[in-house]
């Protein structure tokens, strides 16, 4: 069901059994897979490619222009896999250059107020706590847990199954299977 009060471009490719609520905004160069739910006031911008079975909650912006001084208007992409839950007020930027991509894998849970910046690559089955900020060009593995208010500085890498505790800010890589805590970051567990 697509609400007649949603603004959906006729050029957008919308899959089967997609629900788009009133006041959602979907631009021309967008692909939304089957069985997705787009709640009110969501904006899905050009260059966004979304798989199936995703839920996107109110006031989220997907595929926003990158917050990067190097951006010159390239037609870049945001790729979102299948089965993700993207809660309220999340912003995910697309890549800076036309040959780049921001990638969100499958079955991730992004809680309220998360920001994922340009050219970041996120694996699968990760949890991003409230207000977590992932800067540009980061690489996040699989099954990582970010507690609330974590800040990952540009170019950081996080290995599989790491856990980052609330309020941690880091600019160096977090190895797999590590508990990271504090500011500046230190390792435990």
Show where each model-derived region lies.
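Structural signal for interior beta-strand "rungs" in well-ordered beta-sheet cores
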Residues: 2-181
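Conserved beta-strand-loop-alpha-helix hinge in the C-terminal portion
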Residues: 183-189
